């Protein structure tokens, strides 16, 4: 489940509710500008004028959307993210679970930039959730570190024996 699925849910909502067809880039722009995962009375009133093609006439048309409306459009996909996190936590080994309770959940990737997603996950799991310092690059930077020094992989993951044998000191 990723940001692309959230974009698709926004585009589908616009098609169903407003008879407005928008492209992937417009849906992403809506998500970035007024998308939110957690209620915020002030931000929920934020509006954005969006242009697209009217589904029935085929002519260009614009509609004004609110942040609260877009949160509802994203709700099903956000619910899938919450459920995936909960399922993962349920399967987490006790030692790691204790670490997560102490340190919290760290969000990375473009989805971490959805306004309020950390608040939503904190609220739903009861575990403090924060966003990585550079969520768009931190995963690839970490992979780069492991590739530069493959022995670091042993400290990060429970690696299969054939990999442990390949990276022995």
Where is each model-derived feature located?
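Glycine-rich phosphate/diphosphate-binding loops and the adjacent beta-loop-alpha structural elements
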Residues: 60, 65-70, 95, 99-106
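Phosphate/ATP-binding catalytic cores across multiple sugar-kinase/actin-like superfamilies
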Residues: 73-100, 146-149
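Residue-level signature of catalytic and energy-coupling elements of molecular machines
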Residues: 10, 85, 107, 143
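Phosphate-binding glycine-rich/basic clefts of nucleotide- and phosphate-handling proteins
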Residues: 1-75
